[in-house]
């Protein structure tokens, strides 16, 4: 081992030259017992660390970032959340990359209406090669449980035959930033604030579910296919999910590939727990001070 790469071996050696040359070639020296022990300890430590991270992320808490505006006004692009993994049980989708190590669903429970959940999107339709339709993690709000009937009429959700109260409240305004620029806000909704800064302004409402749980939603305009739907009956083992930004959310109101249809309970990965960071996207790597000015500090620590 090591001699074939040592140029000194190519010279005519004497019987005693080889051990002398080996002693002088650091690359040819065998590891000492201490070095081997340290290397093995490092490998064992890294394996243990990887196992701890795998278990923690799969079964306790995992991070999640918000990539789109479908959950405005509650969640902004650039928000980072912790998601609790134990609320609804575990399935293969609880594990990184959906590794099929868990058969079916264990310790399962049904979410409550109004919960904000992270789930794995349905598999793309056969022949669908659009990368946007690849399975990925998504966040939406639970509106319907197994057996519920749901319909949207005139932009109002009808749950089990009764309209969910929808109260008009103050407009939702959001500054235009690199994370949410003019391409995300149509010209009809662009405005300026008191300081003359560009903002996006949407009509905002408060919905209140049976039992008193409430949350804010946006209604940008009248869109017939989103605001006036057929009657849905949620199948057993599934839930009906909607984005809070009702006119800009691909959710259970629409079948794939436009939406997602009903979501099987086993695809739910966890429940949104708390925001741990938020950025408006203006940070630059070569300007460290912008790492702080870009942070939306007031959003850190907001719970659900």
Per-segment meaning from a language model:
Residues 41-61:
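Hydrophobic membrane-insertion alpha-helices, especially the h-region
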Residues 2-39, 60-65, 70-304:
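Soluble "head" domains of membrane/secretory-pathway proteins
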């Amino acid at each position: 081992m090591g001699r074939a790469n040592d140029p000194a071996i190519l010279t005519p050696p004497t019987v005693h030259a080889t051990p002398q040359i080996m002693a002088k070639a650091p690359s040819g020296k065998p590891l000492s017992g201490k070095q081997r022990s340290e290397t093995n300890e490092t490998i064992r430590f890294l394996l243990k660390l990887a196992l701890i991270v795998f278990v923690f992320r799969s079964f306790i808490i995992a991070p999640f970032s918000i990539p789109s505006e479908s959950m405005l006004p509650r969640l902004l692009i650039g928000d980072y959340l912790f998601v609790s993994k134990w609320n609804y049980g575990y399935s293969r989708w609880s594990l990184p990359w959906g590794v099929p190590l868990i058969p079916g669903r264990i310790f399962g429970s049904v979410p409550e209406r109004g919960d904000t959940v992270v789930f794995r999107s349905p598999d793309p339709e056969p022949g669908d090669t659009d990368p946007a339709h690849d399975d990925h993690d998504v966040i939406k709000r639970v509106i319907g449980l197994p057996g519920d009937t749901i319909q949207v009429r005139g932009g109002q959700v009808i749950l089990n035959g009764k309209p969910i109260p929808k109260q008009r409240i103050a407009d939702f305004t959001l500054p235009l930033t690199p994370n949410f620029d003019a391409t995300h806000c149509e010209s009809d909704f662009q405005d300026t604030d008191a300081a003359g800064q560009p903002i996006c302004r949407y009509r905002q409402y408060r919905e209140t579910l049976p039992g008193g749980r409430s949350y804010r939603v946006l209604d940008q305009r009248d869109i017939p296919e989103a605001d006036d739907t057929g009657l849905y009956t949620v199948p057993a083992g599934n839930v009906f999910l909607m984005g809070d930004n009702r006119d800009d959310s691909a959710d259970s109101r629409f079948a794939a590939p436009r939406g997602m249809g009903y979501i099987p309970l086993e695809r739910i990965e966890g429940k949104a727990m708390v925001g741990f960071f938020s950025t408006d996207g203006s940070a630059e790597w070569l300007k460290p001070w912008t790492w702080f000015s870009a942070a939306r500090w007031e959003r850190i620590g907001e719970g659900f």
